[in-house]
């Protein structure tokens, strides 16, 4: 509750879902998500038939200074990490599949100038992480990550499936650091 109130005061544009959001079950998540003054986005958890149906979107499109920004979220595999009764009815989709589908929609159908992934997959961990996600996907420009509690002093730049640069950043844990990423875009979108 305190976190959402602070996020509201800080005027967050969007947030995604981490494994700890499931710690107290779906009813608690729904209550907290209703308090959020910003959208909750996650493209690879599907909530049809649960109390979270309609509270979580796959993505949101923001307009900032004439730049159209598509923002979507991804969550980690819950099985083995969260008690199964705490995510009953939630369907998990492979993050790479979900990311490619949504990023393509944002870039090619919605014509977003910039596509940002809010990832809770982690960095340099066993299993699918942000490094593997980037190398297997297209159309993502920035990955703002979490889960592994990694702190980057400067963004890491990785190559996507097309050999294009993707900027990745993480700010550790417990709100110890606040990140700021300044982007310059040319009129052609470069």
PLM feature spans:
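Acidic, metal/ion-coordinating pockets
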Residues: 1-190
């Amino acid at each position: 509750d305190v976190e959402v109130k602070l996020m509201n005061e800080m005027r967050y544009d969007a947030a995604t879902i981490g494994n700890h959001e499931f710690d107290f079950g779906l009813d608690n998540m729904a209550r907290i998500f209703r308090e959020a003054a910003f959208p909750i986005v996650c493209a690879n958890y599907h909530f049809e038939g649960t109390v979270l149906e309609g509270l979580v979107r796959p993505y949101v499109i923001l307009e900032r200074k004439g730049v159209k920004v598509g923002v979507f979220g991804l969550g980690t595999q819950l099985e083995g990490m969260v008690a199964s009764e705490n995510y009953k009815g939630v369907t998990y989709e492979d993050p790479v599949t979900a990311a490619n589908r949504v990023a393509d929609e944002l870039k090619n159908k919605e014509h977003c100038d910039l596509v940002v992934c809010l990832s809770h997959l982690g960095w340099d961990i066993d299993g699918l992480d942000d490094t593997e996600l980037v190398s297997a996907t297209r159309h993502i420009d920035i990955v703002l990550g979490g889960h592994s509690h990694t702190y980057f002093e400067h963004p890491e730049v990785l190559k996507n499936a097309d050999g294009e640069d993707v900027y990745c950043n993480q700010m550790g844990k417990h709100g110890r650091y606040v990140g700021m990423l300044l982007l310059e875009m040319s009129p052609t979108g470069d």
